[in-house]
């Protein structure tokens, strides 16, 4: 363990790139840097396999995210060369009471992974995957591995994780910290429900292996725990047989309630392996175009899809059915060309004041209709409105909160606003708060990957019966409260 430096003591044993850190001032709660940018041997910090960065470009990048709304500037960014680096630096930050946040792909929209005056740990270098064999039932991966890479590595052996988010270029550690929802949840639960073990660095700098049967309190406090009790550095994921091809259906509906009812029927009956839906604006700007997306997996995981059996009894417009077969990975990665086009058009730099709500099935149509009636195409911009039907009994992770009803819906309004239009961003943030309150009034909550202003009291309400266990785990595993302050929970 590194010794505590004196008030203006030099820090030894670390090579820092960019602006060189020459000392930490506990009274001022800051690290001093030289302007020379030369690499310098410093005192007190542990030696690292990776690098610590305090240059302007690194700090500016870490003070931004996909939302481009919140900006909290750290004093340093760690690019670890090993898990040992994460352990050592978290231990040092705990000694000095410096806040710490891990950052995967920077896809958070509201400053969740930012940290003012502290240390950001980039997890992308921790991206090992495997080994995987033909008969494997699990795979162990680094927290910085992207789901696209995990899919490719496992598909080489005819295997796949059972649940994916629609966008594959997210880090494993990032989605496991929030939940990991997609169109397969009604069959397999969330991504967090398909984890068999973790390696975690606690807020005290302890490296811990945990699972449902070993240090289970930490295991359950970290999955969907928003980084409050530990930093995931490695996860063991469940694997299932992968289909070779899938059949993708798109069904059109005239009204919201029928659209949601048919989603409910499909997940209750388990006809499809993937169910999702979109709502878009009609020619007059009203959000009345409803498209249900459903996917049936083919051999070797299931029989060849039978169109008549799969679509029987549904109330879509039969004249507008679109279906097609495609390779499984192409289906998983179907957003890739859209993302590439968005980046080329500059949309990736837009502000993203996202609304993500968990709505109880009995109130989903009423609450979402009110929100959609107030939404304009200009508010949504080049974004999208999504519905995912969820079955309560498949969601077993305590900190992944949803309604108590059998069927809930994840309702997403994923707006994209030109970055200089701060008035619209502020207005949408206010609207997001109002929408959350409407959801909470009927037993819903947020899925915490969006941009909803939240207080500490809101978080206690959000976690509900799970709050005492989370609070206890926070005291045990992050007693000085240094981890992920950007969530605003404690």
PLM features per residue range, with description:
Residues 3-22, 29-35, 196-366, 381:
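C-terminal substrate-binding/cap subdomain adjacent to the FAD-binding core in PCMH-type
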Residues 4, 24-67:
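C-terminal segment of N-terminal export signals and the immediately downstream linker at the start
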Residues 32, 43, 64-165, 179, ...:
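Glycine-rich N-terminal segment of FAD-binding domains in flavoprotein oxidoreductases
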Residues 160, 188-192:
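Short loop/turn motifs at secondary-structure junctions and domain boundaries
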Residues 286-290, 335-345, 392-405, 457-468:
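Short glycine/threonine-rich loop-to-helix capping motif typified by GTGT followed
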Residues 340-346, 353, 440-490:
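Activity-critical C-terminal alpha-helical subdomain
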Residues 347-452:
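Substrate-recognition/cap regions that form aromatic- and gly/pro-loop-enriched pockets
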